[in-house]
A protein has these predicted regions:
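AAA+ P-loop NTPase catalytic core
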Residues: 1-161
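Conserved nucleotide-binding/hydrolysis micro-motifs of P-loop NTPases
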Residues: 86, 96-98, 134-138, 169-171, ...
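Hydrophobic/aromatic beta-strand patches that form the interior of the parallel beta-sheet core
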Residues: 89, 129-131, 194, 210-213
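Short coil/turn segments at secondary-structure boundaries
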Residues: 94-96, 103-106, 142-146, 175-178, ...
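Conserved catalytic/switch belt of AAA+ P-loop NTPases
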Residues: 111-112, 146-155, 160-196, 201, ...
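Short, glycine/polar-rich helix-capping loops at beta-to-alpha or helix-loop-helix junctions
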Residues: 116-119, 197-205
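Short, structurally constrained coil/turn elements
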Residues: 122-124, 187, 205
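A short helix-turn-beta junction within AAA+ P-loop NTPase domains corresponding to the substrate/partner-engaging
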Residues: 126-127, 201-227
Length: 227
């Protein structure tokens, strides 16, 4: 019986490997025909993404003394992509990881035709409706801010509205569980929604949005920030 079991396992794994190899070969062939064969190389997509982020960051205007480090660069790039596509986003990290600064830089650079750089004049202006979360927050208050942002968007011209939930993690301390309202408004929202938090929320919220979790900065990032 042991021999038969071992033979069955060997046959199963052989079949599985053969199937995966066939699927991978077919996928690679389709990938090559699509014109993106260069991305098949290890790390090619990551390098391309880093170059796009670098170009994006080079067109951002920041105040003197603000370092365009990795945290701020990634936050800005992902934040802009999510806002333009109305994808909910949570930026999670300790104080000092450029969460609030990210939104300040986005709103000061994306002003439509009044943007300080030509690069951003092709994008719509960003209008932020902010709600400061706290342990006293209520689901009704969050819902009202959301509806107000939606009404603004309905009458806006060449403008994208973003609901900013600042310190959203603090609302989890409320016994009334006000963040349960996010379960519905995070599903295909007509506006962009961004939440900033010092710690991760429960999976019921996080799984409904893109999430950036800022870890400890690298030595290179610390050096760049201090320069």
């Amino acid at each position: 019986l042991a021999t038969e079991g071992a033979a069955a396992r060997e046959a199963y794994w052989s079949k599985l490997v053969a199937t995966l190899t066939y699927q991978r070969t077919g996928s690679e062939a389709k990938f090559a025909k699509s014109g993106f064969a260069g991305f098949a190389q290890d790390g090619a997509f990551a390098r391309c993404l880093a170059q796009v982020q670098k170009r994006f960051a080079a067109n951002v205007e920041v105040e003197p003394g603000v370092a365009m480090n990795q945290a701020l660069t990634e936050n800005l790039f992902v934040g802009l992509v999510c806002i333009l596509n109305k994808l909910p986003l949570f930026i999670v990290g300790k104080p000092g990881t450029s969460k609030t600064l990210t939104m300040q830089v986005i709103t000061s650079n994306l002003l439509g035709q009044q943007s300080p750089r030509e690069f951003f004049r092709k994008f719509p202006a960003i209008h932020v409706v902010q709600y400061q979360c706290s342990p006293m927050s209520s689901s009704d208050a969050i819902q009202r801010q959301y509806e107000m942002a939606c009404r603004y968007q309905a009458h806006a011209h060449d403008t994208l509205t973003c609901l900013l939930l600042d310190e959203v993690g603090l609302a989890e301390h409320s016994p009334d569980m006000p963040l349960k309202v996010l379960h519905s408004i995070l599903v295909h929202p007509p506006i962009a929604i961004i939440g900033l938090s010092n710690w991760a929320l429960d999976p019921a919220k996080m799984n409904r949005a893109v999430c950036i979790r800022r870890t400890e900065p690298s030595p290179l990032d610390i050096e760049l920030t201090a320069a």
